[in-house]
């Protein structure tokens, strides 16, 4: 998916390296993946030596680790942590980074003197969405409020199942756009007022513009896009059984700020989902008001300032 998203962008050269996944649990792959990381470091060193960047920017994830280790001493390193608490990859890369940008101000306590509160970068194309184009794409008239449901590129099966079970009741009040994830489309459903797509990229800004409320997981990048667009959301974070708990913390922060409602997956049923969606819609104006007063929703300029500062220091 990553290559399909960035491979054709003007001015972007896509490189691949070997990388081992960083796990907090026992797996036989833990015996082999360290060798992939070492191999990735040497591959990244060759690429960096050829490209000779003025600065290296890391957004986290296990693929970033060999790149950042390789870049140490070859170029300034700026890392960015999206979540409320640093993930394992960013805990490692922060040791090598010159600056660590954070999305949440509270995260500064985890990264020390290198930290700078910037917010998170928001894709500029999201601001160019058009409601009518979104309606035309989905075939909806716009007479009913629109619920946009998204669970990331891989989807969220628990949300998919609860939503589909509640469809007959929900579609009485809402038109529903469902981004269900790769391989999770159910062609047996022919419910008026319901459209489903495995994954959307180009048309996503228009779907955001058409949506009145959003149902989603609580990944930091996604929820800050909702904040930047002032879209009220019902957040169902990944449970601890399937994550390190970062989405639970992200969702809790948004709930405390009055930006979103949360529903634990353990309490997710068609009935609780139905009630929560209606509650979210009824309270949407208060959420919009709270979000509209946040000046840190889009951290693009702040992150760029840090990157430029480090790059200019390298050039000097």
Predicted regions and their residues:
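C-terminal alpha-helical cap of glycosyltransferases
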Residues: 279-282, 296-316
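C-terminal "capping" alpha-helix adjacent to the active site of nucleotide-linked donor transferases
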Residues: 257-264, 268-285
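Donor-nucleotide binding loops and adjacent catalytic segments primarily
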Residues: 5-10, 131-216, 248-251, 263-272
